[in-house]
C-alpha cells in the first residue's frame, strides 16, 4: 500500500550544500487504516509552529549566506549607554552596518548579517549577530561600536554543519517565550523580555524544489 511523502530540497551555496526536508502528507494514509480525528489547534501549537518556521528560515539563510570562518558576534551595552527602547537599539545597529557596508563595497564585497536584539528580564541589552568576514571584520565591528563590549568568535568547520547551524538558528531567534531546559529537565523562566530578529535585505530565502514521493508499505501476517 502507498503512503505519500512530500520532499523539499534546497540547493544552497551554488549547489555545494543540499538540505532535504520530508513530511508525510496528512491527506493520505495507509490503505485500510482510518484517519485519526483532527485535534483542535491550541495557541501553544501555533506558537510552536511559528517558532519552528522562524528557526528553519534562519537556518536556511545561515547555510546559504555564511560559511566556516565567518563571525558570530555579540554587542553589549554599558549600563549608562543602554537604549531607552527597541527602536533606538535597531537604529544604533543599523548605523554600524551602514558604515561597514561602505567599507565592504569599497573592497568589492557584499555585506550579509543576521541579528537578534534582546532586552533581558533584568534590563540589560545585547545584540547577537552573524556577519560574513572579509579578513579584518572582527576589528572593524569592534571599532564601530561605542556603547559597550564586543565579543567575537569564528564559525568553525564542522562534521555536522546542519546541526550546528540549527543550534545557531535556535539561539539567534530567541524571544520572550523561549524557555531553556535546565539540567533536571524542567524549563527555566524566560530570560528575554523583548526581542527583535532581522537580517540584511540582500538575503532572499532560497526556494526549495518540491517532489512528491510514494512509499510502499508491506504488511505481513
Residue ranges and their predicted role:
Residues 1-123, 133-221:
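Right-hand nucleic-acid polymerase module
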Amino acid at each position: 500500500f502507498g503512503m505519500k511523502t512530500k520532499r523539499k530540497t534546497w540547493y544552497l551555496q551554488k549547489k555545494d550544500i543540499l538540505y532535504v526536508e520530508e513530511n508525510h502528507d496528512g491527506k493520505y494514509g495507509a490503505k485500510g487504516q482510518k484517519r485519526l480525528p483532527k485535534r483542535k489547534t491550541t495557541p501553544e501549537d501555533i506558537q510552536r509552529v511559528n517558532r519552528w518556521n522562524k528557526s528553519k528560515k534562519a537556518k536556511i539563510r545561515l547555510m546559504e549566506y555564511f560559511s566556516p570562518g565567518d563571525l558570530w558576534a555579540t554587542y553589549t551595552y554599558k549600563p549608562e549607554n543602554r537604549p531607552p527602547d527597541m527602536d533606538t537599539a535597531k537604529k544604533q545597529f543599523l548605523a554600524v552596518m551602514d558604515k561597514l557596508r561602505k567599507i565592504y563595497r569599497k573592497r568589492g564585497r557584499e555585506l550579509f548579517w543576521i541579528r537578534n536584539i534582546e532586552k533581558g528580564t533584568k534590563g540589560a541589552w545585547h545584540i547577537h549577530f552573524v556577519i560574513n568576514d572579509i579578513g579584518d571584520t572582527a576589528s572593524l565591528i569592534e571599532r564601530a561600536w561605542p556603547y559597550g563590549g564586543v565579543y567575537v568568535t569564528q564559525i568553525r568547520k564542522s562534521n555536522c554543519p546542519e546541526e550546528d547551524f540549527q543550534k545557531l538558528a535556535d539561539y539567534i531567534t530567541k524571544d520572550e517565550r523561549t524557555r531553556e531546559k535546565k539540567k533536571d529537565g524542567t524549563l527555566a523562566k524566560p530570560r528575554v523580555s523583548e526581542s527583535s530578529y532581522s537580517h540584511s535585505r540582500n538575503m532572499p530565502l532560497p526556494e526549495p524544489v518540491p517532489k512528491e514521493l510514494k512509499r510502499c508499505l508491506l504488511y505481513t501476517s
